[in-house]
Amino acid sequence: MPAHFGIDIGSTSIKIIKSEGKKISAVSVISNATGKNLMVMSNAEKIALADQIKEMVKTVNLKGKRVVASIPESLVFSRIMKFPVMSSPELATAIKWELDQSVPFPPNEVETSWAVLEKPNKIKGDEKISVYVVAVPTPVSDAYVQLLELVELEPMRLENEIPALMRAFSPILSNDSPSIILDMGASGTGLILVGKEKIFGNYYLPFGGIVMTKLVADAFSLPVGQAESYKRTYGMAKDQLEGKMFSVLKPVIDNLSGEIKKIAIAYQNEHKESSVNRVILTGGGAYLNGLIPYLTESLERIEVVIGDPFSGLNVDQKYKSLGPIFTVSYGLSIDI
């Protein structure tokens, strides 16, 4: 693929990365002044966002215009589907039928891609073909292309966030003992069960950092900005603020922990010879104070680590500790 950079356009921030082998040659992050995802912005807000990104590209002195951009998981349909063993034409028909039942958009307004993950070599009983399917509403992909064209960039590819996360963490993933990538964003949280080159399951929870900040704001009667600062400073530390912050955030984190346990148990039941061995935290929520020890205690035999896509890379020192917020944009910047 020709040289390009990756851009991750989130509802609260925009991240840009250009990577050249082991070197990060350009990196930047700015706040999204609208605080919205692209699909609920007015035309004026889209133009203002495009101007923001133009200035961002100019500031980091990016020479090329080719870009690969992500579409948030909340705006796409992505799922692993299982079908009886059948021919490729039959499989294509079965996937189309399944999508027609599952996706709340007319078939002519959805762009679909799929890849066979696992196909039995021999049919013994009720073996299934495992297929990873992604469907993007055409209005969504059109909106992202139009925004990038407003910025005068050349979109080479749009993709959901999961492939970028897998590429970013490929060096530490294993097909024998899969990991759960816990992508803690502002608007939502993704849980992706993955091996090195294989996805076993993906789940999206419609709550993230914004929900936790609002809980803190309500509990302590604070403005949202101050609540965000409190959340970052004290987090899940039981010995801070007499444990009050811990008590506010605990139900949210317990919910996450419960989902992780369900995923791990379901995988173990299906793969007797293997087990989930690690949770990789990424996204802005990965920095929550006290999160790792709390999850480690809750999950018992599963290791919990912060995933750093910048590990082993040459990157500007001021961004070195911010790897988790750049995971998607870094994954987008890597050649397929």
Features from the language model and the residues they span:
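Glycine-rich phosphate-binding loop plus the immediately following alpha-helix
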Residues: T34-M41, T138-L165, E197-Q240
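Glycine-rich phosphate-binding loops at beta-strand->alpha-helix junctions
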Residues: S274-I302
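Active-site neighborhood for divalent-cation/phosphate handling
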Residues: I71-P171, P309-G312
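Non-catalytic, solvent-exposed interaction/assembly segments
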Residues: M1-E98, S102, D142-Y144
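Gly/Thr-rich phosphate-binding beta-strand-loop-beta motif of the actin/hexokinase/Hsp70
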Residues: M1-A33, K65-P72, P171-G201, L205-V211, ...
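Glycine-rich phosphate-binding/hydrolytic loop that grips phosphoryl groups
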Residues: A164, A286, V305-I336
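Adenine-nucleotide phosphate-binding core of ATP-dependent small-molecule kinases
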Residues: D218-A219, S229-R278, G285
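Short glycine-rich phosphate-binding loop at a beta-alpha junction
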Residues: I53, L62-S74, L148, L153-R157, ...
